[in-house]
Amino acid sequence: MDALKSAGRAIIRSPSIAKQSWGGGKHKKLPENWTDTRETLLEGMLFHLKYLGMTLVEQPKGEELSATAVKRIVATAKASGKKLQKVLLKVSPRGIILYDSASNQLIENVSIYRISYCTADKMHDKVFAYIAQSQQNETLECHAFLCTKRKMAQAVTLTVAQAFKVAFEFWQVSRENKDKREKSGSDGEGASSSQSDGSSSITSLKASASANLLDFEDCTKAFDVLNASDNHIEDLFRQNSTNENNNIVWELDDGLDEAFARLAESRTNPQVLDIGLTANDLQSEECLSPTSWDKLELNPAEADELFMF
């Protein structure tokens, strides 16, 4: 079974994803079964890409919309004649964090709640792109990245979609707790009861985590290729050494909460991030192979085909 096809079905069919505690630690390899490691996605999955650029768009989602935006970005990148910037893209339920590969300097941190669409472009099939609402002026921006191969662009897209499902569950809990606090008002007893209810619900969600992260039947097959015998895989999934993500209760500011609610209204299904991938797109004899994801340099022959995607 094609790995990407299985992963795609899992994103569509998987049950509600329970909340987990955020962890840190040293680098480590993935286990034989990726679905056994809850922290893998929660702590962030890393992808080595090349940044093509950004352009403004008028709508939060749409295949034709994103295709036009990507075409414009690629044309601008070609015209500039500049070497593409190598970047490290970290995907987690908190969002997309972009680092410069050479300096490790933070370029951008986009909350998952501001992302309205992502896709592996049809025309330029090595390009991954996402649309997000700007934090500064609330305009909609389409950002595009060049991957080493088409399967990698699809893998990044599916990873962002899966991260969104986790984030949506966090958002629901945050909203529920916020509503309880508002109802309890300034009454001490009410506040205590609200806190107890919140803790109880989170404990219950954590208890069911191992069973609900992904659809086991499909995703066990989909991620069998991500196993500890692959010497390259540990370089792709580096855990954050800080404890910045240890708190599983996310407090959203009113602006972000409103932005997410507004973007949710534009989705086909508010609980699922719209992606420009279909079952037909994922049908291929080529399996998702992470061994080439960490390929940073193009050989001379490939360099001439930099924009021939």
Swiss-Prot record:
Residues 41-195 form the PID domain. InterPro entries: Adapter_Engulfment-Domain (IPR051133), PH-like_dom_sf (IPR011993), PTB/PI_dom (IPR006020). Keywords: Atherosclerosis, Cholesterol metabolism, Cytoplasm, Endocytosis, Hyperlipidemia, Lipid metabolism, Steroid metabolism, Sterol metabolism. Residues 179-201 are annotated as: Disordered. A motif (Clathrin box) lies at residues 213-217. Pfam families: PID. One of its GO terms (cellular component) is early endosome. A motif ([DE]-X(1,2)-F-X-X-[FL]-X-X-X-R motif) lies at residues 258-267. It is found in: Cytoplasm. GO terms for biological process: cholesterol metabolic process; endocytosis. Residues 250-277 are annotated as: AP-2 complex binding. Residues 189-201 have a biased composition (Low complexity). Expressed at high level during oogenesis and embryogenesis. Found at low level in the adult liver and spleen. Found at very low level in testis and heart. Not found in the oocyte vegetal cortex. Adapter protein (clathrin-associated sorting protein (CLASP)) required for efficient endocytosis of the LDL receptor (LDLR). Also involved in the vitellogenin receptor mediated endocytosis of nutrients during oogenesis. Interacts (via PID domain) with ldlr (via NPXY motif). Binds to soluble clathrin trimers and to the adapter protein complex 2 (AP-2, beta 2 subunit). Binds to phosphoinositides, which regulate clathrin bud assembly at the cell surface. Interacts with the VLDL receptor (vldlr). Interacts with the vitellogenin receptor. The [DE]-X(1,2)-F-X-X-[FL]-X-X-X-R motif mediates interaction the AP-2 complex subunit AP2B1. This is Low density lipoprotein receptor adapter protein 1-B. The gene is ldlrap1-b.
